[in-house]
Amino acid sequence: TATTSGGKVELGPEPFPDGGQIALIRDPLGAGFTVYQGNSPAGVTEGVGGRRGHALFVSDAHAVMPFYQALFGWQCGQDNNGTRAILQGGGTIAHLHEVPDPALRGTEEYWAVIFSATPNTSTRLTGSGGHVLASAALPEGAAKMATDPDGAMFFFTENAS
């Protein structure tokens, strides 16, 4: 379980409206994520506006990988392009970025979602009250780190058509 592997369950498991259950967990370094047990959620899209990938940004990959291995059976390895990745069954679950310097990573360890977007997304984002914080070269492509008007952080790539 999460707690016996060094993590913390912050919420749940709680019932979800579709009959499943949801919980909020933090890994040993504090990166938070949500787990869901139940039927596959409807409305998951690919392409523009959809999820392009996930990434874990931590100060010490060796400190958290035993947790994810115990909880989900994930392994640390390399994807087909030789990039450090979190793997399961030969497939890439997420990319793993070890960023020890808090000046580059920020003060927190975190999971990030990378979305596919159209080339004018930066302009639309700032016009809607969001902010582009930085550019980053990620395995998913040239990405922008951004926040929505409420401060929630995410990444997007503007190379989708």
Predicted features and spans:
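A generic structural signal for solvent-exposed, polar alpha-helical segments
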Residues: 42, 73-74, 78, 116-117
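Vicinal oxygen chelate
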Residues: 3-50, 55-56, 78-102, 122-161
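Short hydrophobic/aromatic beta-strand micro-patches
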Residues: 57, 114-118
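Eukaryotic phosphotyrosine signaling hubs
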Residues: 110-111
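Hydrophobic pocket-lining residues within nucleotide cofactor-binding pockets
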Residues: 16, 61, 117
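Amphipathic alpha-helical segments
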Residues: 1-4, 60-75, 121-127
